Amino acid sequence: MAGSVTVADLVKNTRLDVYHGADLLEKKDITTSDISRPGLALTGYFNYYPRERVQLLGKTETAYSKNMSHDERLMIFRKMCQLTTPAFVISTGLPVPEELVQAGEENGVPILGTKMTSSRILSNMTNYLEGKLAERQSVHGVLVDIYGLGVLITGDSGVGKSETALELVKRGHRLIADDRVDVYQQDEQTLVGEAPAILNHLLEIRGIGIIDVMNLFGAGAVRQDTDIDLIVHLENWTPDKQFDRLGNGEQNRKFFDVEVPEISIPVKTGRNLAIIIEAAAMNFRAESMGYDATKVFDDNLNKLIKTNSVHDSHK
């Protein structure tokens, strides 16, 4: 399920100024993350005018509009200000054309502005809207920021996910979501997880109930969202189940178009899962930086075998 965004949300999260139409912000919905630079529309070409997008006017567009007469500008801006148009944004602190204000008032389109350049505000708005409007998938698990890595802890109910997350928070790491994690794809290689609004900062511990992590441990113990870099799946230990002992059994889990590395950790009485998951996160970071402990072990083992073979051949 995709999220929903109003112009009011966009204004708040991208630090836009409201020039006209403040009473319309909550009523105007944004349905696409694409931002329009309406250069062709200013020339009068409206065959493919994307009226459902936020319209961004920069130096080029405003300079071109100055070459028109008052009546021409008013006619063009009236055509551009459609009922389905969420808003107009004027970048670089440029003055707002009076005709645009009039057309916006007539058709209920807010006029916004910023001192940021067109490139910067375009990037900010696109990134924000892509995150909020992306399709979401709910995952049963706990998401924790460990040493700057987003670790999604999954497993059957009762296996100890929340208790492990609590221990990780006590050890200085940060909770993002417990029980339910909303996951969305930010770009071709990035998966982001966040908590549903109703579960923000909350952790459920059997026997205690629901605790507010931010109130108990402070604002430094929580985060709003994080990239998901690693999945740790907790499984109850059974004698007949084979678990990876060398770290060379690579597994991935796919969400949308992104594959995330996954490791399975057996749960057994007496094992300190928080420390094990910390070690898994640090080992993953080391591997991403080019150091592979398993490969080093294999290389050393092969050298030892080769050395022993040479010695045996000389006997």
UniProtKB/Swiss-Prot annotation:
Positions that bind Mg(2+): 162, 204
Region annotation (Important for the catalytic mechanism of dephosphorylation) ranges: 266-271
Gene3D superfamilies membership: HprK N-terminal domain-like, P-loop containing nucleotide triphosphate hydrolases
Alphabetized GO MF terms: ATP binding; magnesium ion binding; phosphorelay sensor kinase activity; protein serine/threonine kinase activity; protein serine/threonine/tyrosine kinase activity
Active site residues according to the UniProt entry: 140, 161, 179 (proton acceptor), 245
Superkingdom of this protein's organism: Bacteria
Positions that bind ATP: 155-162
GO biological process assignments: regulation of carbohydrate metabolic process
Positions of the UniProt region annotated as Important for the catalytic mechanism of both phosphorylation and dephosphorylation: 203-212
Keywords: ATP-binding, Carbohydrate metabolism, Kinase, Magnesium, Metal-binding, Multifunctional enzyme, Nucleotide-binding, Serine/threonine-protein kinase, Transferase
EC number: 2.7.11.-, 2.7.4.-
Required co-factors: Mg(2+)
Reactions catalysed according to its record: [HPr protein]-L-serine + ATP = [HPr protein]-O-phospho-L-serine + ADP + H(+); [HPr protein]-O-phospho-L-serine + phosphate + H(+) = [HPr protein]-L-serine + diphosphate
Alphabetized HAMAP family for the sequence: HPr_kinase (MF_01249)
Domain notes from UniProt: The Walker A ATP-binding motif also binds Pi and PPi.
Subunit structure: Homohexamer.
Similarity field: Belongs to the HPrK/P family.
PANTHER family, per the entry: HPR KINASE_PHOSPHORYLASE, PROTEIN YJDM-RELATED
Misc: Both phosphorylation and phosphorolysis are carried out by the same active site and suggest a common mechanism for both reactions.
Protein name, UniProt field: HPr kinase/phosphorylase
Origin species: Lactiplantibacillus plantarum (strain ATCC BAA-793 / NCIMB 8826 / WCFS1)
Lineage: Bacteria, Bacillati, Bacillota, Bacilli, Lactobacillales
